[in-house]
């Protein structure tokens, strides 16, 4: 039996690309110059992904400004002073807010996918941002002649199109980044905000067939930016009863960074559905230390004592650099961790298959 293994998405950008993005934003580098840097980073990312032996790859999100804001890049209807997200180490990230409607994506994720697919024969996975995250773009003060209800309807249509375009463009699967799930419980422990997010995302997922939803997954983590988190103190026992309500086939969960792994596994077993597959993070993206394949093997063997192997897979805890300017994790370290995940998964797979053979002979 094969154990599925997939990356989450982002890979740290080369320093020359980060500097190029900053220069471009200041008007010191033209579009052509930036595109050359992006093309070089993308080609190198795919080459290095292939060298890890990964059966599925991503484009490393080399040209995304961030995992959350790519759809609104270049929009003329933005106020930079939107929702502020605080992290445990004291730094913050701030979303913009929209200033008018109708709300439309400026960029769809399939544009990244199609570019990557031209450079590799391997299956390419595509990450998209959740509708719930983009719902935070609507200002609390409202917008004249553009109600929140109108905005939500436009958002649902655009979020559906973002997923569907990637599926139609040949994505191996599509992963919805839902990192605000845990944060929602921290902000509102009653669960009201998280349930509203779940309901909104299910309105998008409900537009897809059961077969299509087998190729759609959801990623949840406590945030990972500059080696810090925004909601690691929220328990999986509180999160998962909500999360598994989502009408998706695959769930990509931060796990390696969890202190009480036994309780996490118990909560997964209690809440996951029979048709859902859980990919556990087996590399801690906030820790610069590279896991050994043997450590990952042992983590997998422990997990598969609780989670059925046919509903189990491995991944990384989070993207390695969800925001383009994050240099806290080295590019080399990221690929070393991915290689360790691939090798550790294979070690566990061999042992599990050997045990299965022994039990049946």
At which residue positions do the language-model features occur?
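Domain-level signal for soluble alpha/beta catalytic cores
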Residues: 1-361
